[in-house]
Amino acid sequence: AEAKISINNYIEKPIVIKPKSTNFGTGINIFPEGTNAEDIERAFEIAFKFDKTVLIEEFIKGKEYRFLVIDDQVVGILHRVPANVLGDGVKTIRELVELKNQNPLRGKGYVTPLEKINLGENEAIFLKQQNKNFDYVPLAGETVYLRENSNISTGGDSIDYTDDIPQKFKDIAVKASKAAGAKICGVDMMLEDYSDENTNYAIIEINFNPAIHIHSYPFIGTERKNAVEVLKLLELV
């Protein structure tokens, strides 16, 4: 009831609505350009399915990067691209998703480097913001994004940026990890321009159970063998 009363405060404002304590991008809806009361209310309903407490956050512009910190050092950085399909001018979004999901790197249950793309309520809401639906036929060469959040767990693609991000942001990620008292964690950071150390940035989340294997098998880029860093931390090697 309290959430519904507050809806009018957020109409047409760039916001993120998400459960307080979930992982893997579950229950999250993002409205980078703002939206109407109906979509906000539906986003609340989805989020409350997963937690008794729901957060409303300001949407931060930029691209999201996952910094994997192990024992006070950054051992991998991924840019995660939201679930998407590339049009051919013939197939619908539904058909393109089915085709992309045939990639052997994609599976279900977080046992593969990438997850299969889902076509559910969250994806339908995000496509609606683009005046599209699952039966839309993208133009040849047109990329259509199905979600705003870029989690691998919701069908996103992964690109390794470990060697490309300025040391300044690696140091910030380590400081965030230390502040949280974590020896292993994933720091999610938004950067407007990853190549500029003076760019705007924001830490949007710290994860205490980060997926390590996604850095070992990126969709694009260098494979990072980070399991050995965990073994070193545990003094097993």
Regions found by a protein language model. Give the residues of each.
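Active-site nucleotide/adenylate-binding loops and adjacent lid/helix of ATP-dependent enzymes
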Residues: 1-118, 166-171
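Glycine-centered flexibility motif
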Residues: 25-27, 43, 62, 141, ...
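C-terminal active-site "lid" helix and adjoining low-complexity regulatory extension at the edge
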Residues: 152-168, 178-182, 191-237
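Membrane-targeting and insertion segments and their boundary/processing signals
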Residues: 14, 143-147, 200-204
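Hydrophobic faces of well-ordered beta-strands that scaffold small-molecule active sites
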Residues: 17, 54, 185-187, 204
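A long amphipathic alpha-helix within ATP-dependent nucleotide-binding catalytic cores
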Residues: 50, 100-195
